[in-house]
Design a protein with these regions (language model features):
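Conserved small/polar residues in nucleotide/adenosyl-binding loops
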Residues: 229-236
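Conserved strand-turn element in the central/C-terminal portion of the radical SAM core barrel
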Residues: 96-98, 176-186
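Active-site beta->alpha loop and helix N-cap motifs at the rims of alpha/beta catalytic domains
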Residues: 22-30, 51-147, 152-162
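N-terminal basic/disordered segments at the start of proteins
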Residues: 2-49
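Active-site-adjacent beta->alpha loops and helix N-cap segments on the catalytic face
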Residues: 71, 138-144, 186-198
């Protein structure tokens, strides 16, 4: 599981929005942490907020790039984030998806459930709350846009966008609400400063990457994780 935290800084409102991992895996932790975060904000910096919590249940074939060990009930998970008005993101960042995987029952049921989550009750926190999907595969991107249009999409860091021009091309796509570039672009301030405000607002930075800066195998590692933890498990059933 990649436990990276990303932050989106909005210049017109100087607040750092952190996107936390372990939506399913750390469910029991969030049951304790979220009430604490809401009731005792004096324990935390006033310039930070929770932008979303992301993850996928164990054994999701659309998952990818990281191993998942979450076994919590999706309805319980959804109830928790909805109660606190937090966007939930499904980590469906598989890079080796094939056409036959699109009909997977479990993943489609999750998308349907998360797409309509804010319609389930009249809690004031759920007003205009929207959930999303972190995606890598263009095949899956097109499928989600067609079948689950109310889920917003995030371009996954598993694409390993290290070239700044490629990153800008991704930023300018209307398909994505947010883009997570490779961590090696985090400090190219001279280029980041030249971006428009609209472009800047779409960027989320990976803050605690475990790879060393000169790693040349990061993309291959993500693909290996997909092959061994997702595709192979499903193909051997």
């Amino acid at each position: 599981m990649n436990t990276a935290t990303t932050a989106n800084i909005q210049n017109n409102n100087p607040t750092a929005f952190y996107h936390l991992p372990g939506l399913f895996e750390f469910y029991e932790l969030y049951r304790i942490f979220l009430p604490l975060f809401r009731k005792h904000r004096e324990y935390f910096y006033d310039w930070c907020e929770i932008g979303s919590i992301y993850g996928a249940p164990s054994d999701c074939i659309w998952g990818g790039g990281r191993t998942s060990f979450g076994y919590s009930d999706p309805e319980d998970v959804l109830d928790l984030v909805r109660e606190y008005g937090i966007s939930a993101r499904l980590t469906f960042s598989i890079s080796l998806l094939r056409e036959e995987h699109l009909t997977d029952k479990k993943c489609n049921e999750l998308c349907k459930m998360f797409e309509h989550a804010s319609d389930a009750d009249n809690s004031p926190h759920t007003h205009q709350l929207q959930n999303g999907v972190i995606v890598h595969s263009e095949l899956l991107l097109n499928y989600l846009q067609k079948n689950y249009p109310d889920l917003y999409l995030i371009s996954s860091t598993t694409k390993v966008l290290t070239d700044f021009q490629d990153f800008l091309t991704e930023i300018n796509r209307e398909d994505f609400r947010y883009i997570v570039p490779d961590f090696r672009l985090n400090k190219v301030f001279d280029k980041l400063d030249l971006m428009s405000q609209h472009q800047k607002d779409k960027v989320e930075f990976l803050c605690n990457e475990c790879c060393w800066y000169g790693c040349k195998e990061r993309k291959q590692c993500y693909e290996t994780a997909v092959s061994y933890t997702h595709l192979r498990a499903h193909e051997t059933r």
